[in-house]
Amino acid sequence: MSRFLICSFALVLLYPAGIDMYLVGLPRIAADLNASEAQLHIAFSVYLAGMAAAMLFAGKVADRSGRKPVAIPGAALFIIASVFCSLAETSALFLAGRFLQGLGAGCCYVVAFAILRDTLDDRRRAKVLSLLNGITCIIPVLAPVLGHLIMLKFPWQSLFWTMATMGIALLMLSLFILKETRPAAPTTSDKPRENSESLLNRFFLSRVVITTLSVSVILTFVNTSPVLLMEIMGFERGEYATIMALTAGVSMTVSFSTPFALGIFKPRTLMITSQVLFLAAGITLAVSPSHAVSLFGITLICAGFSVGFGVAMSQALGPFSLRAGVASSTLGIAQVCGSSLWIWLAAVVGIGAWNMLIGILIACSIVSLLLIMFVAPGRPVAAHEEIHHHA
């Protein structure tokens, strides 16, 4: 079982590492490519677009051909794209490389969740996804620090060679450690069950909405945090970095505690707690009389996301034993596109950073609480339905 956990964690972590590691080198990249930093900031959106594009096909391929045939090309593409970025001499070529990186990371991301659905039952999967969420929170803190240390001695291209090295390590894991977990092709008697695993069932769609809104909350916070903390609240750059590190610490602590909480409380209770924390955060930020109270509201955001997201993802994947790849892709596309659409629309309409965050917090909590309370889980995994544990 440990091989599947290690491989799944590695497959998922490629995605945030690809986002956060290069940011520290952005000024030098812009100077070398004769582009402005503003022009290259679109590299974040291009990377996410690549991920979304990969998710359009990766899930279906993973369900038909297996998890390894998607993970291996995904890791290989990430390696090639990282090298391509390091060799880019124009901003257009650099952005093309970032799109290809996103394609590779998206393939790996989809496979990771499909593997966890293949190998873990509902309760264990919720615990593992909560742990994974905590580990993922470390990357935005560690990746820029690692990038800074690398650039003390080496040029910005070394950041992408480091990413390529990470891709090589993942490729080796996928080739030699990861075992295929895709369930056997459905027999004639399994066809009714396969057909019953519809992406349009109410429970799955409710969890798609909940997880998409939750991701929108956390990405809105990340995107608006420089404005909120430095421009509005007046913190210096060093203080901003410290606050963001502390929020990551809150996320990690809550995420690592959630598996223990699942041994005491029902998953539904933790999901309700998550949304109540979001609602409390929105109200706190809306009426905050001081910076200290605002910072407390920010910690509620991190805690709310960490306590509920892994549980919601586990519930979303639960009904799909034969179509886990497609379900994982659907979740990923909805989360990437939905959160990006909200941030873009809010900016176009001219909603300020503070109101943008408060608005999504309150909307997410109200909609999600209604869905949690009124959309009951579908059928559990039947007793005869095998959970695939491989040696």
From Swiss-Prot:
Subcellular location: Cell inner membrane
Record's keyword annotation contains Transport: yes
InterPro entries: MFS, MFS_dom, MFS_Efflux_Transporters, MFS_trans_sf, Multidrug-R_MdtL
GO MF: transmembrane transporter activity
Gene3D superfamilies: Multidrug resistance protein D
Stretches in topological domain Cytoplasmic: 1-3, 63-68, 114-130, 179-202, 266-268, 314-330, 377-391
Annotated membrane topology: Multi-pass membrane protein
Protein name: Multidrug resistance protein MdtL
Gene that this polypeptide is encoded by: mdtL
